[in-house]
């Protein structure tokens, strides 16, 4: 059983890392990893980032890097240096400027400590993982047992009301559409030019942040196809809608 689990872990790691995936693994009994990193749990989350600048930083360090997300708890994620500066202001002395995130949403978190399960939908679609391990994967991103961050019902929120699956916006709402259309209204915003879900995911947080900074008090979003990375977009919108 352990050898099968080990083979599965190696297979997924070799195929998808470095990339937008985080692995939750069981700790060894004699592990020297700090309890402050594991939150006193018997598991640890491991990530192999793909960005060249961050990989260069990791090579310079003589130890693994433990770091929280670049956003305040429950708030919108930061996907570019200006977002980080906006969120944290003078609390940060330095910002490692690597440009805008290429994917735009957080990593997929997969629990490999037991039978494979998705703890958080993210930048790597579940369908791609299924093709590699050829096994059914449970999606537990709404589980009450939150062994992973980013799973609270209210999360990734712009701090203003947001509605999903909207056909027609109310007066004064910013209306977010998946595909660009010829509409003569300043209240309409577009996630992509041609219904591209990958680009929509990349533009999601910057567009919502832009809308909020323009002074809108409410956001309405049309129905997003719930396939591929569209599942992740809908997950983030659903959590943001709990405000």
Please give the residue ranges for each predicted region.
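Active-site-adjacent structural elements in enzyme catalytic cores
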Residues: 6-9, 13-243
